[in-house]
Amino acid sequence: MNPVVHFEMPTQDKQRMVAFYAKTFGWKAQMLGPEMGDYVLVTTMETDQNSRPKTPGAINGGFYPKSADKPAQYPSVVVAVDDIRDSMRKITEAGGKVLGEPMEIPGYGLYISFFDTEGNHVSMMEPTAQMKSGGHG
């Protein structure tokens, strides 16, 4: 099985969204800046020295800026896969639609989004060898 390892939510105002989730749930945020697409890493629970959740089954996530040229902007999950190309093939064969080509996220792995058969926006990531072994970026 391939586990859900991350969640993502779009934002119009990252400062406002970070403040909301910090105040409401105590989540912590790390702003990555323009060189990483103004992505915000979100920690939802205590993590170990490798930035992995200490609570089994728990996941962290991120916020990304909404953009007029990207129509699929709503909360989604990220599934870890061993072989992103093989998973892309399986998605297409099962009736889903892969959105573009995988992009490399430095230190993390290959990432791509897709629509399932019900139109849900989901993403998947093939982690780097370092991430698979418990290392972090």
Predicted regions and their residues:
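Short acidic/glycine-enriched loop/turn segments that link adjacent beta-strands
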Residues: 35-39, 71-73, 105-110
